[in-house]
Amino acid sequence: MEDFVRQCFNPMIVELAEKAMKEYGEDLKIETNKFAAICTHLEVCFMYSDFHFINERGESIIVESGDPNALLKHRFEIIEGRDRTMAWTVVNSICNTTGAEKPKFLPDLYDYKENRFIEIGVTRREVHIYYLEKANKIKSEKTHIHIFSFTGEEMATKADYTLDEESRARIKTRLFTIRQEMASRGLWDSFVSPREAKRQLKKDLKSQEQCAGLPTKVSHRTSPALKTLEPMWMDSNRTATLRASFLKCPKK
């Protein structure tokens, strides 16, 4: 699974996921499913935000990468992916600037057009079950919830899906492709079922013991499917900005 994640996702997303797991004391070598889930969630958050801007008239517009316009403002503020201290600093700044009610839990995004925080969910289960779990945890009508599944289903607060159909279809297609690629490598069942994941981990550990000391040959080739799977959605200028702000090392 770890190899799949490193081949499948944008390097910046992998780096952010590693940082997040380290912050919470989790070992990505053991919690490989969580590593994959975090990367998937991060990518959906970035895809949700990318190419969406607010023009000088306050209208929401879509601008593809490479169309420069200094008067445009990003519609969404990305909170997910930042360390907790910085994330809360961003949330507090948004609340002070916009007058929005401070959420009890860290949300994933802030929508400057609708003036609301957004909680993004990506589930391997039924969307309505995961939606209810999120709603019960957040207990706030102010935070908008939007859930996506790997089967193309989605559910949002008051059936308000925020994004246009094409943008949402892009996210659904990406999730479905990830599922198909996992399945083709025999990874999907263990990703869905914790019990299956434990069984697979024991099997892997046992096979590692049996193979200890044997010469190994590692292939670094990328399959044609994974070449097309690699996301090309990120705005290159914004990628550089995000990398600088999200991955900045604290001064000693």
UniProtKB/Swiss-Prot annotation:
Changing residue 108 to A: Complete loss of shutoff activity. Pfam families: Flu_PA. One of its GO terms (biological process) is viral RNA genome replication. One of its GO terms (molecular function) is RNA binding. The keyword Nucleus does not apply. The record marks 195, 198-199 as: Important for efficient shutoff activity and nuclear localization. Keywords: Decay of host mRNAs by virus, Eukaryotic host gene expression shutoff by virus, Host gene expression shutoff by virus, Host mRNA suppression by virus, Host-virus interaction. The active site is at 80, 108. It comes from the Viruses. InterPro entries: PA/PA-X, PA/PA-X_sf. The record marks 202-203, 206 as: Important for efficient shutoff activity. Plays a major role in the shutoff of the host protein expression by cleaving mRNAs probably via an endonuclease activity. This host shutoff allows the virus to escape from the host antiviral response. Hijacks host RNA splicing machinery to selectively target host RNAs containing introns for destruction. This may explain the preferential degradation of RNAs that have undergone co- or post-transcriptional processing. Belongs to the influenza viruses PA-X family. The probable endonuclease active site in the N-terminus and the basic amino acid cluster in the C-terminus are important for the shutoff activity. The C-terminus acts as a nuclear localization signal. The C-terminus is recruited to host protein complexes involved in nuclear Pol II RNA processing. This is Protein PA-X. It comes from Influenza A virus (strain A/Brevig Mission/1/1918 H1N1). The gene is PA.
